[in-house]
């Protein structure tokens, strides 16, 4: 069967890129992104175009949450054979090699030539026929996937064309109101691409484990420092820290985790986040009281013990529901 072209007209104005990051707890991060995507794509009578990108090439998972609903593919066609992010940037690398010194030191021009030579729509699939919701999966999961993912040289692509990733983001936001990037955890070149070069917004999910918040703080600091020190990257980066508790936390333990208690030797996450953002943005006064009163994710997300909203028959509007938690986040971040 011939694959029909996926045609997405340009949006009325540029969209925005939001990266979802967690130093650990990838399940919470991915489900938070998936739920956000469903709610955003439901806006304006389900006509808001949203693209999810699975950049966690080591442990990809968004394709499991969103089985393809793309009419270009035969039902029997194995999901393993569908191209995605990895194949797209393999093609970018090949184009850069073919260009040689074409464009010289004009990296913006080189990025334009590379991106115009690749049909990005071939790497994107529709995953919800009721909404304009799309996915660029991590890659084609054939026998060579693991080796190719390990071999992907994100630093090398950046060195060959520093404008490539920034231009890639701008390229996609001409067609999608929201581009949501599922970034792998830890620290790596891929993490730097996703948190420093691509986004307009960074949603950082963290758990009570101290290293979770420490890891997030390090990524935020490096991203903002880079943008402040590199002229071509000087654009705002809005940071939205998102606490994800643990099942069994009662009100007292949640408050202790949030506010801390010097007498018990507990440093709360709110004062640490407020100091982090004051230092990063160079502002004297900052309070997260109102924001953190509303934006808190359920502990079950950290264990991946809940279904994402797209898999549920209907959205639950209960005050303590998953839907309300994500809607509260989007009320601030989107």
PLM regions: where:
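Walker A/P-loop phosphate-binding motif and the immediately C-terminal alpha-helix
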Residues: 11-58, 64
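Short secondary-structure boundary/capping segments
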Residues: 33-37, 65-81, 85, 152, ...
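Conserved acidic residues
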Residues: 133-134, 177, 200, 294
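C-terminal lobe/tail of nucleotide-utilizing enzymes
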Residues: 1-7, 226-334
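Extended hydrophobic secondary-structure segments that form protein cores and membrane-embedded regions
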Residues: 18-20, 51-55, 134-137, 238-245, ...
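Catalytic cores of eukaryotic secretory-pathway lumenal/extracellular enzymes that build
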Residues: 27, 39-41, 164-165, 183, ...
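Conserved catalytic-core segment of NTP-binding enzymes
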Residues: 160-281
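P-loop/Walker-type NTP enzyme "switch/lid" segment
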Residues: 57-170
């Amino acid at each position: 069967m011939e694959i029909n072209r996926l045609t997405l007209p340009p949006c009325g104005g540029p969209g925005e890129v939001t990266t979802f990051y967690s130093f650990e707890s990838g399940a919470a991060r991915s489900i938070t992104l998936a739920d956000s995507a469903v709610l955003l794509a439901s806006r304006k009578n389900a006509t808001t175009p949203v693209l999810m990108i699975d950049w966690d090439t080591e442990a990809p998972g968004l394709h499991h949450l969103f089985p393809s609903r793309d009419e270009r593919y035969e039902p029997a066609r194995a999901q393993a054979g569908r191209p995605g992010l990895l194949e797209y940037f393999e093609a970018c690398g090949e184009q850069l090699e073919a260009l040689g010194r074409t464009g010289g030191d004009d990296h913006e021009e080189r990025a334009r030539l590379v991106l115009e030579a690749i049909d990005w729509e071939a790497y994107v699939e529709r995953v919800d026929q009721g909404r304009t919701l799309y996915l660029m999966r991590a890659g084609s999961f054939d026998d060579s996937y693991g080796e190719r993912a390990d071999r992907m040289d994100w630093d090398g692509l950046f060195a060959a064309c520093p404008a490539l990733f920034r231009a890639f983001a701008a390229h996609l936001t001409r067609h999608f109101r929201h581009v949501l990037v599922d970034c792998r955890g830890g620290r790596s070149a891929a993490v730097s691409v996703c948190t420093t070069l691509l986004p307009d917004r960074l949603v950082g999910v963290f758990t009570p484990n101290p290293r979770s918040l420490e890891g997030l703080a390090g990524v935020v600091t490096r991203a903002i420092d880079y943008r402040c020190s590199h002229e071509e990257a000087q654009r705002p980066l809005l940071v939205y820290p998102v606490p994800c508790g643990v099942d069994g936390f009662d009100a007292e333990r949640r408050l202790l985790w949030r506010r801390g208690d010097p007498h018990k030797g507990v440093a709360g996450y709110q004062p640490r986040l407020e100091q982090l953002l004051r230092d990063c943005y160079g502002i004297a006064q900052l309070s997260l009281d109102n924001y953190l009163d509303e934006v808190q994710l359920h502990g079950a997300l950290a264990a991946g013990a809940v279904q994402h909203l797209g898999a549920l028959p209907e959205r639950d509007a209960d005050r303590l529901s998953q839907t309300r938690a994500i809607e509260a986040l989007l009320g601030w971040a989107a």
